[in-house]
Amino acid sequence: MPCNCFKSNVHVQEYKDLLVFGYASTIFPNDYQSEHIAEERHTVPCLGDPENRVDRYDCRLLLPSIDVAIKRNGSPSEQCPTEAMEEDMCEEERYLDMYKDIQREQEKEEEEKRRNDQRNAIGFDYGTGKVKARESDSEDEPFEPPEGIKFPVGLELPSNMKLHHIIEKTASFIVANGTQMEIVIKAKQRNNAEQFGFLEFDHRLNPFYKYLQKLIREKKYIPDLNKRPKKLTKTSRASTSKPAISSSLAAIAAAHGSDSEDSDSDYELHPSLLSGGAKRPVTPEKPGAIGPRKKPVEPEKPPDFTLKPVGDISQRNDVYAALFKNLAHVTRQAAGVEEVKMNVEEAKKEKENDHLDDPEYREWYENFYGRPCPWIGPRPMIPATPDLEPILNSYAEHVAQRGLEAEASLAAREDLQLHFMEPKSPYYSYYHHKVRMHQWRMYQPIEQNLSPLVLNSPAPPSAVSSPGPSSLMSLNLSTPEPPLNRRQRRRLLDSSRLDESITEPGVIDPITMLQIPKSVSTPANLDILKTPISFSLRNDEPRDESSFRFDPDLDETAGPSDTTANFSDISGLFPPPTPPVIPPSTQMQVDRKEKARIFMEKLLQEKKAKKLQEEEERSKLEEETRKKAEKISESLSERKNTGRSDRREEAPKGARSLDEIINNRINSLLSESGFEPVEEMKRTDEDRERKRHRKRSRSRRRSRSCSPRDRSREHKKSRKSGRHHRSRSRSSSRDRHRRNRSRSRDRRR
């Protein structure tokens, strides 16, 4: 009974937070629906078979025929090796996470075991193997000097190899990075004096450290930092305990294909459950098999055996060492000559291999620059960066339209910094490619409109040497080129203004467009051009607005019209091509930019004019004030010189008269406002003090001459007179205040 109570309490505690609630519902039979289902009126015939009726949502209704569902192929299908391999790969990918999780858990268990049983772990042994004695650790190994180095007598050496490795590594680091790093290491390792105490000057190993540092700096000793001290690792322990494994365990491991020979875990999974445990047999693949193929197994290369000398022969003092030292200089000279020859040959090969052999490029270079090409072809093309691409494209188009002189004028301007026009630039070949591309686009419509006579005649050199679509469409030109910013457009306009003298705008000569070679230009070969050529100049015709306007500052209405030529009488020559046309939107943008520039210049000029006007006004005011000051100073100096004596006499009177006028004016204002003048009050106070002083002096004189009774009488009289005087002064001040108040009231009214 108590057990049941305990169990019930436990269940109550488990489901204490669980809450179940619901609502009451009324269930009633649906006679119509039940009758409908009982009579199977909700079913439909399956694929036209009235006897076989199914629900209208049955999936068998989707089949074209019922025979497809009934028909079954009893014969097993042949298994293809590629399909089997695909299935194995799918299975491996399907359960890859499970295998990885198992491996992760196994690694965690091994780490926990290693931590808990690190000191007490003893490998299992059947007693058949030989137990080797444990090797001494490298930390306790005594110091052994490196091969080929003799330390001076009296130099104190480190006690073990561990300390020697620390000193060696520190010395090589200081030699490589400078002596300042020694201060940094000393500051960081100030608490580790046991290992880095040799950095102190008074330490016993500091001379050894300095001597080792000197050897490394002079390259007499090169330490092998990759060489690690010998430590007793798990692999070495496992190798020592390999003979202790019995033959039965080796047979079991070989049968199951286990790869872990030195595993100490007793709780491993069966090898068949591991991902890499079971090795599949290697089956030869068929040559016509379709599907994934296995990676071919590469044969292992045998290790390279290199024989190293036991010691440095140059450090010996015998006969062979002397012979070696004498022959070392000769061998070094021969090796140096061979290295120089090899370097020269490699440089020549690199220069030859750097440029690609392209005869079309050489022909175009010779026709464009007028000199033979110094290379066999262009360098490998490196596309420009996104920020350089629009600038390079715009200048390449400008050079393609204007020619070599435009390129020379642009390259001479250092403010533009057009480094891609230099042959040393990595984008030089890409720049030439863009120039050829724009030339080909320019001459393509001309070639399409040529007459048969002109097509039979030799073509212009630029058209012949211009690249065709086969050689120029290697790059993706479908993407639109980004527009130029304000600074780039301004630079392009400035460069076009500088080059206006090169080609006159609006004048097109068909003979120069054809560029007849010298062999054709002789009089004997010019039978085609015997017919007369008539030219007509039209000055009254309006200028064609669709043509490209090179200078936006020119007025469209002013100036004579362009020179035109009538080629109606020429037989065999095509009409002159139209000038390059730019869209109206671009022309409007250029006009707006020019108007904005003119407007900004006007604003700047107005500001400058205002500043100049303000400066002039300031200078005028300064001049006037300076002149007034000079006049005043002159008048004062004259007065001082002429009437210095008269001024001394009249100055106090004039000053007194001015002071009296000012004081009277102030007193009148104060009296009008209802206040007593300050000066009058001061004067009355002074007068009173004087009177009192006089009375006291008189009373003293009398007291000296009179008796004590007379003195008392005089004292009483003076008291009475003082009281009377005070009462009179009070009454007079009251009357004065009343008068002032009445005056102020009258003024307000």
From Swiss-Prot:
Superkingdom: Eukaryota
Extent of Pro residues compositional bias: 574-583
InterPro entries xrefs: Surp, SWAP, SWAP/Surp_sf, SWAP_N_domain
Compositional bias ranges of the Polar residues kind: 560-569
BP-aspect Gene Ontology terms: mRNA 5'-splice site recognition
Ranges that cross the membrane: none
Pfam families linked: DRY_EERY, Surp
Keywords: mRNA processing, mRNA splicing, Repeat, RNA-binding, Transcription, Transcription regulation
Bias (Basic residues) ranges: 690-704, 714-749
Segments of this protein annotated with the region Disordered: 105-149, 256-310, 458-498, 537-592, 608-749
Biased composition (Basic and acidic residues): 105-118, 538-552, 608-659, 679-689
Name this polypeptide is given: Protein SWAP
Gene assigned in the entry: swp-1
